[in-house]
Regions:
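Phosphate-binding glycine-rich loops and their immediate beta-loop-alpha structural context
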Residues: 88-98, 102-157
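Beta-strand/loop nucleic-acid-binding surfaces
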Residues: 22-38
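Glycine-centered tight beta-turn/hairpin loop motif at sheet-sheet or coil-to-beta transitions
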Residues: 18-20
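Canonical P-loop GTPase G-domain recognition
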Residues: 139-190
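A conserved segment at the C-terminal end of the G1
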Residues: 196-206
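Helix-rich effector regions associated with P-loop NTPase G domains
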Residues: 11, 37-65, 72-92, 96-98, ...
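Conserved "cap/hinge" positions at secondary-structure junctions
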Residues: 52-54, 103, 201
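Structural detector for short beta-strands of small beta-barrel domains
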Residues: 1-9
Length: 351
């Protein structure tokens, strides 16, 4: 029996079958031993084969139970290094059409290093990205100028950006259109307003929200597990004629099309994930890190040496472009930080 993982609460997974039936599932014991280097062998968004059982029930469980016996082929996924196990990865979500990163310029500030690490991981696993700049109603003139500069930088690199406010609803219609018909990952630091945005997009989600810490201007973890929520139909006033896949593709978009049986859930869905304070990249070889920074990869073709790391080598086109202000210093510093990953704590500045 085949189904979609729509919720992950640790060792238990909620699976929705093709027929709409829900099961509380665990991964079959010997399935865990197949050389999987992840803290979670399956993730929300995975299509799996399940075998109904009559055994152990999860705490407070009222659903029938089953064992997950097989993962169907993934068309993509996005991972980060497990926060406490540097040699293992954590699969954030699988089979997604769009990776949305909710960021804030202040209250709290999302570091450019965090943003760039997320973008690099999405590039590596061929997942299109939408940067959602939230809380625009709170910014003063200086912060607004910084926001404009950030959006200009990332749009110039080919990334789609939206400025939104969960309070005034600015940009929410544009966000609804961007998410329509797609399975979208929602990720971001704690405190950026991800849960509030989710409640506006999917009122039935009833995601918990919390006040920022007055001492640190950081958020508390209000989402403790990953869950998929179906989006409501797009209002008719926002519907536009669909374009062909070729005309709507963007840089970084995977050319791997989903199998018919794994097509996006109409009219779309959001995979909500717990807030994270750091984004450790996983399984990147040192010499390939620059491949996931679009501008560094393009300019790096002009370097004297094919294996240039853009640090101290002579004839480095990237260093020359940096000196000429042709690439952003923040992006280059993010690149350097990924070359020298040591601990998760440095990925986000302390307040």
């Amino acid at each position: 029996m085949r189904g979609l993982i729509i919720r992950n609460t640790g060792s238990w997974y909620t699976v929705r079958t093709d027929g709409g039936q829900l099961f509380d599932c665990k991964v079959k014991g010997n399935f865990r031993l197949r050389g999987i280097r992840s803290t979670n062998p399956v993730a929300v968004g995975d299509w799996v084969e399940i075998l109904p059982t009559t055994g152990e029930l999860p705490p407070g469980g009222a659903l029938p139970t089953a064992l997950i016996t097989e993962i169907c082929d993934r068309r993509n996924y996005i991972i980060r290094r497990a926060s406490n196990l540097s040699k293992q990865s954590h699969i954030i979500a699988a089979n997604i059409d769009l990776a949305c990163l909710v960021v804030t310029i202040a209250h709290p500030e999302t570091s450019t290093t965090f943003i760039d690490r997320f973008l690099a991981s999405a590039e590596a696993y061929r997942v299109p990205v939408l940067l959602i700049f939230n809380k625009v109603d709170l910014y003063d003139a200086d912060e607004q100028r910084y926001l404009d500069g950030m959006m200009y930088l990332y749009r110039t690199l080919g990334y789609e950006c939206l400025a939104v406010s969960a309070v005034t609803h600015q940009g929410m219609d544009a966000l609804r259109v961007a998410l329509a018909g797609k399975i979208s990952l929602f990720s971001g630091n704690s405190g950026v307003g991800k849960s509030t945005l989710l409640n506006l997009l999917v009122p039935e989600a009833r995601a918990k929200t919390a006040e920022l810490s007055l001492a640190h201007d950081q958020g508390q973890h209000t989402t403790t597990f990953s869950e998929l929520f179906d989006l409501p139909p797009l209002p008719s006033a926002l519907q536009v004629p669909s374009s062909s896949p070729d005309s709507s593709s963007s840089p970084g978009t995977s050319d791997v099309q989903p199998p018919a049986a794994q097509s996006p859930i109409s009219p779309g869905a959001i995979i909500d994930t717990p807030g994270i304070r750091g984004f450790g990249t996983f399984d990147f070889e040192r010499e390939e890190v620059s491949h996931y920074f679009r501008e560094l990869f393009q300019i790096g073709r002009e370097c004297r040496f094919g294996n240039c790391t853009h640090t101290n080598e002579p004839g480095c086109a990237v260093k020359k472009a940096l000196d000429n202000h042709e690439i952003a210093e923040s992006r280059y510093l993010s690149y350097l930080s990924m070359l020298d990953d040591k601990d998760e704590g440095k990925y986000r500045e302390k307040y």
